[in-house]
Amino acid sequence: MTWRATVLTLFPEMFPGPLGVSLAGRGLAAGLWALEARDIRDSATDRHRSVDDTPAGGGPGMVLRADVLAAAIDAADPVPGRPRLVMSPRGRPLTQARVAELAAGPGPLIVCGRFEGIDQRVIDARNLEEVSIGDYVLSGGEIAALALIDACVRLLPGVMGKLDSSAEESFSAGLLEYPQYTRPKSFEGRPIPEILTSGDHAKVAAWRQAEAEALTRARRPDLWAARSVARPAANAPAKGESQKTPKNKTDG
């Protein structure tokens, strides 16, 4: 069965957007995954195709109506079983682990909110999982949905050109990715670290692991703490070893 993402949106013309180019686009054209963007307004019942109304209790903006959105969900997903997501800044943070779960399934139905939000009753009645891609507010859920789909699609078989590529990137092993270098060998007086051109694969692997751990400790202490809980022995410093972040030879 082909992995399929179904998106409910007021702006279906935003899809596939950037998902139609590069690796994701080639995979889409080759049938490695599928995308369906459905207009929420198609489920409106009045002649104006209204989808929103003023907030109960007062306040600024408009709220997506529960009846219209429920009808759109039921039409797109008549037999519940797929993950049903709604992109929301108040949702649980999207993680690489959750992305891997979604990529391993049939593909999600994703609701893209607009205005002040969505009537809570449809979130509860249709069991929508609220998902956030960060602590900031966007104009709507479409950009967040594109990011989520892209993260999933690149894990699908055949989409990535090199099988190891996704496994070695940030978050895949609970760590940020190590620094990358390529030609020229020297750039503005900054050389590629010698160990990367040594041809010693074991030393290269050890260097990359150390750099990934150092970056994670320095930039994402939350990830490092979670990894340390899961793998205390692996992350404990050796006797007499400091926790200082190692410097590249290019750091001065």
UniProtKB/Swiss-Prot annotation:
Keywords: Cytoplasm, Methyltransferase, S-adenosyl-L-methionine, Transferase, tRNA processing. One of its GO terms (biological process) is tRNA N1-guanine methylation. Transmembrane segments: none annotated. It is an enzyme of class 2 (transferase). Residues 229-252 are annotated as: Disordered. The keyword Repressor does not apply. Gene3D superfamilies: 3.40.1280.10, tRNA(m1g37)methyltransferase, domain 2 (1.10.1270.20). SUPFAM superfamilies: alpha/beta knot (SSF75217). S-adenosyl-L-methionine binds at G113, I133, G134, D135, Y136, V137, L138. GO terms for molecular function: tRNA (guanine(37)-N1)-methyltransferase activity. Pfam families: tRNA_m1G_MT. The keyword Nucleotide-binding does not apply. Residues 241-252 have a biased composition (Basic and acidic residues). InterPro entries: Alpha/beta_knot_MTases, tRNA_m1G_MeTrfase_C_sf, tRNA_m1G_MeTrfase_TrmD, tRNA_m1G_MTases_N, tRNA_MeTrfase_TRMD/TRM10. One of its GO terms (cellular component) is cytosol. Its main location: cytoplasm. Residues 229-238 have a biased composition (Low complexity). It catalyses: guanosine(37) in tRNA + S-adenosyl-L-methionine = N(1)-methylguanosine(37) in tRNA + S-adenosyl-L-homocysteine + H(+). Its EC number is 2.1.1.228. It is found in: Cytoplasm. Homodimer. Belongs to the RNA methyltransferase TrmD family. Specifically methylates guanosine-37 in various tRNAs. This is tRNA (guanine-N(1)-)-methyltransferase. It comes from Rhodopseudomonas palustris (strain HaA2).
